[in-house]
């Protein structure tokens, strides 16, 4: 395991700084199918990281609403959404290679042309590659809740991240989060409510019912049978 939670950054004088990441990069073993997908389909759907803005319309070869998903896991839901919404362009980011391979394989089998995949830290992608006010939706489904209190600072949903997402959304664009850990849902709501320029789309100013746009996962169905909850939050950029 490579600990990527803390990564070095440098100030203007070249002094090393510590940056807390929201994930630990686990180099899981690739199956033969996942490796084949990476070798065969990455050149078609994969996007290499670059520290400069990218033209998203050129990336997809067309102009269409753009949905960015952060941390797509094995890609099952992402591929389903891209299949069900051919009128939209989807950009998925995942740091774990087996998930990237699995997603590429599923996307190829589905014959998708509206999906692009990245294997990199999503914060760096947002900071450096995504143009300002270019995204119609950002999706963050079931991020690591970092249950222990001493690890809460590693949660990706923090004020600087939420501000960063807002800057990349178009006015009217939506930041959609979902979690099955109630303390994290409460944390998300507190952070989002403290940032100006967002409108909570919940009528009760808290959580929204799962929209049809977010597929119901097998894990979620199993949790429902056991009485476990899932909390969706949707906030629109209003300015």
Swiss-Prot record:
Its EC number is 2.1.1.33. GO terms for biological process: RNA (guanine-N7)-methylation; tRNA methylation. It catalyses: guanosine(46) in tRNA + S-adenosyl-L-methionine = N(7)-methylguanosine(46) in tRNA + S-adenosyl-L-homocysteine. The keyword Signal does not apply. S-adenosyl-L-methionine binds at residues 69, 94, 121, 144. Keywords: Methyltransferase, S-adenosyl-L-methionine, Transferase, tRNA processing. Residues 150-155 are annotated as: Interaction with RNA. InterPro entries: SAM-dependent_MTases_sf (IPR029063), tRNA_(Gua-N-7)_MeTrfase_Trmb (IPR003358), tRNA_methyltr_TrmB_bact (IPR055361). PANTHER family: 3-DEOXY-D-MANNO-OCTULOSONIC-ACID TRANSFERASE/TRNA GUANINE-N 7 - -METHYLTRANSFERASE, PENTACOTRIPEPTIDE-REPEAT REGION OF PRORP DOMAIN-CONTAINING PROTEIN. This is tRNA (guanine-N(7)-)-methyltransferase.
